[in-house]
From Swiss-Prot:
Record's protein name: Pantothenate synthetase
Organism: Legionella pneumophila (strain Corby)
Binding of ATP, residues: 29-36, 146-149, 175, 183-186
Additional note from the record: The reaction proceeds by a bi uni uni bi ping pong mechanism.
HAMAP family given in the database record: PanC
Amino acid sequence: MQIFHNLNEWIRFRNTLSPDLSLGFAPTMGNLHAGHASLFLASSKENHYTVSSLFVNPTQFNNPDDYKHYPRTVDADLELMTQNGVDFCILPNENEIYTDGYAYQVQENRLGQLMEGKHRPGHFNGVLTIVMKLFNLVKPTRAYFGEKDYQQLLLIQGMVKALFMDIEIKSCPTVREKSGLACSSRNNRLTPSQREIADEFAKIFHQNKSSAMISKELEALGITVEYIEEFQGRRFAAVKIGDIRLIDNYLL
């Protein structure tokens, strides 16, 4: 795997690649897990080359503590990428990415105001802006996103369509641990007792019951329920176990 620490180096290299070659892209913030590996493998099966990025994007954290405590595990992340078919990895720094001083942002005013957007103001502006920047840098044929962040997936699909971007957005199923808990970088921050509660969250959330009943059962375990909502045939949830925030969704 070839690693690019400098954006100008990447841009020069990208310009040498034949337009006849397909590029798959799976952007990440690091602290990788099996869910990320599934994106890399899906891309490597469908493209000549697979590109990823490691960048903890400050603009999508509405809570500064979340950004501060987000695990940085670069060496382990690069190893996982190497083992799962990534050919090129971009590791930009904040000054390179935001040369405009955060002056320009991508904003969506409908779906982005619901659920995650309602509870994390500004989050999706940060997501869409960094994804747009990375798309312009990588110029991928296809880009891969997990269904765990399904609202994010819908927004990226909508952005690509609205702005006439010639990129195929591929969705990949949520990867789950044996308990049914969705793989997430935040799972690493759970204490053993919190992890048991998180496993119960996954089981209860997937029960064939009303959202109100599910909320009641979760709250009885001491879980803080931010929302459980149904949207476009899926059920979405965001909860807190202690100070760890977890999200999930599934097709009804």
